[in-house]
Amino acid sequence: MFSALDINNNLVDIDRAIKQPLNKYFCTACKREVIVKNGNVRISHFAHKHKCDCDDYDNDMSEWHRNWQKKFPIKNREVVLKVDENDSVIENCNKIVRRADVLCYGYVIEFQNSPISSEEFDDRNYFYNRLGKKVVWIFNMVNEYDNEKIIHIQEWWNNFDNGGKYKWKYASKTFINYDSYDKDVILIFQFSDVSNEEEDREQGYFERVVWAINSYNDDEDTNFKYFCTSYYPRNFTELMDKIKRREL
């Protein structure tokens, strides 16, 4: 985790805590003590002082993940969400407490840099949707694209939108149950760190998945061997414009 509470219950970012490592900090979810980890192997982060199973949030900590989160105010990062223990939905959730990477304007934004199972992907979507939140996933696909595992075949367009058609060698099983027509779960693939046309070189370039072979229509599991994207939104500015307008 990259943020924690100080003794006055104020949110503190890891960059600030590194300068004051002897201060006490606490997990925003379980309220147990955490310590500053600032070594040479992993990116700087907070970790529980004693082993705790309140969350396995640190599984996807990376510089890429961190840079995305820093685009948002600290109050919107790593927001703890809970399901009411008396809610019947709890029977279908693996966890009753989760830490959203970002929560803003009614959207949960999850940044995924490492492999994730279809079970975990589905469970997070179910959890957040049941709390009335739409979920925006941003997956780091830069290596997949650069190594030509994901190949751009051609473009498509109509009167309302345009985008790309792709072929994916050895497609991930993460999305096997994903419904590409689900308006409450938005899937975005980042294909490059920088767009050649982009003045802000910190934004990167991505595309929103709008179609994949779908189990609801094709009587088989969702198959990302072939999928289509929209070119809009294509960067952080356009994404936030969509989110603020609640148009995703």
Predicted ranges, named:
Residues M1-L22, F26, Y145-L248:
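Non-catalytic C-terminal interaction segments of nucleic acid-processing enzymes
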